[in-house]
UniProtKB/Swiss-Prot annotation:
Family: Belongs to the nucleoside phosphorylase PpnP family.
This protein's UniProt keywords: Glycosyltransferase, Transferase
InterPro entries tied to this protein: Ppnp (IPR009664), RmlC-like_jellyroll (IPR014710), RmlC_Cupin_sf (IPR011051)
Enzyme Commission number(s): 2.4.2.1, 2.4.2.2
Coiled-coil residues: none
GO CC, one annotated term: cytosol
Domain of life of the native organism: Bacteria
Name under which the protein is recorded: Pyrimidine/purine nucleoside phosphorylase
SUPFAM superfamilies named in the record: RmlC-like cupins
Organism whose genome encodes this protein: Yersinia enterocolitica serotype O:8 / biotype 1B (strain NCTC 13174 / 8081)
Job description of the protein: Catalyzes the phosphorolysis of diverse nucleosides, yielding D-ribose 1-phosphate and the respective free bases. Can use uridine, adenosine, guanosine, cytidine, thymidine, inosine and xanthosine as substrates. Also catalyzes the reverse reactions.
Source organism phylogeny: Bacteria, Pseudomonadati, Pseudomonadota, Gammaproteobacteria, Enterobacterales
One annotated GO molecular function: guanosine phosphorylase activity
Length: 95
């Protein structure tokens, strides 16, 4: 079953799904802007197109991730994103 999500007045949209091969995940697109997300479960985020500048809890500073690159966000935390151009991502929810 697909679950459609919309955040930040439509600037971020995603489709959640369950996959036999990767488990619970979502794929989405973010318009240019700055965003703060909170997590319930640990997350593995992979950039598909564009780039994401990310501030992860416990990190020493902002890091840029480009297509094919992955970052991890701990459970029960917040992380900040700066998006310079429309960008897409795959988010896997880890257990």
């Amino acid at each position: 079953m697909l679950k459609f999500n919309e955040y930040f007045t439509g600037k971020v949209k995603s489709i959640g799904f369950d996959s036999d091969s990767i488990g619970q995940a979502s794929v989405g697109v973010m318009e240019k802007g700055e965003y703060t997300f909170s997590t319930a479960k640990p997350e593995e985020m992979t950039v598909i197109t564009g780039s994401l500048k990310v501030l992860i809890p416990g990190s020493s500073g902002w890091e840029v991730f480009n297509p094919g690159e992955t970052f991890y966000v701990p459970a029960n935390s917040e992380f900040n994103l700066q998006v310079a151009e429309a960008s897409s991502y795959l988010c896997k929810y880890l257990s």
